[in-house]
Amino acid sequence: MIYAEILAGGKGTRMGNVNMPKQYLPLKGKPIIVHTIEKFILNDRFEKIIIATPKDWINHTQDIIKKYIFDSRVIVIEGGTDRNETIMNGIRYVEKEFGLNEDDIIVTHDAVRPFITHRIIEENIDMALEFGSVDTVIPAVDTIVESTNHDFITDIPVRGNIYQGQTPQSFNMKTIQKHYNNLTDDEKQILTDACKICLLAGEKVKLVNGGISNIKITTPYDLKVANAIVQERINS
């Protein structure tokens, strides 16, 4: 089976003085998260589309879905204390409700990346089925510098080898669950990226090409850019 999990656990602290998490802010008349969900319901390969949200925002999320989304595959669950725990909550939900099979995969995506394309979703599904672990990336445009002391440059990696991470990140569910459960509590605090967990466990993580417009809306500037993208698509 193929599942999607939209990660809607962000608090929106970088968005400034707003009274709700950023995924619920309006984008051309609809909450950002609705734009994101709409991209996933267009894909009929998903058995369920899981929305993982903070406990205090479950009812609000359900109300939004009733208003905008008419697809019985969409369900809302409580997210975890951090990103990886939220992913695991999605897997635990599937395990409890349907059981886990060896080839079950989950496509995890940021709720605040509303411009994901059908192509990116399809490639994540196909590559996760084949390779087990997938990350979505775009080539780095700017030169990246590393500073281990936060004062002087300690390294400048070759730009041609550097990519910027996006989402989705997609996984064989049994495999990522096993690797996560093998971590110590301290490791769980340090390893905040699920793909890093796979790498440390010796798994190869397949790259899927993302897109320049697959932006993450985390700041007021990002929201302005997102509105401009939507307006441009309306005009065209």
Curated annotation (Swiss-Prot):
Keywords per UniProt: Cell wall biogenesis/degradation, Nucleotidyltransferase, Teichoic acid biosynthesis, Transferase
Chain positions of site Positions ribitol 5-phosphate for the nucleophilic attack: R159, K216
SUPFAM superfamilies for the chain: Nucleotide-diphospho-sugar transferases
Marked site (Transition state stabilizer) residue numbers: R14, K22
PROSITE patterns, alphabetized: ISPD
GO molecular function: 2-C-methyl-D-erythritol 4-phosphate cytidylyltransferase activity; D-ribitol-5-phosphate cytidylyltransferase activity
Catalytic activity: D-ribitol 5-phosphate + CTP + H(+) = CDP-L-ribitol + diphosphate
Pfam families listed in its UniProt record: IspD (PF01128)
InterPro entries per record: IspD/TarI, IspD/TarI_cytidylyltransf_bact, ISPD_synthase_CS, Nucleotide-diphossugar_trans, TarI
Superkingdom to which the source organism belongs: Bacteria
GO biological process, one term: cell wall organization
Top enzyme class: transferase
Binding site for CTP: L7, A8, G9, G10, G80, T81, D82, R83, N84, E85, T86
Pathway assigned in UniProt: Cell wall biogenesis; poly(ribitol phosphate) teichoic acid biosynthesis
EC number: 2.7.7.40
CDD domains documented for this protein: CDP-ME_synthetase
UniProt family annotation: Belongs to the IspD/TarI cytidylyltransferase family. TarI subfamily.
Chain's role: Catalyzes the transfer of the cytidylyl group of CTP to D-ribitol 5-phosphate.
Protein name per its UniProtKB record: Ribitol-5-phosphate cytidylyltransferase
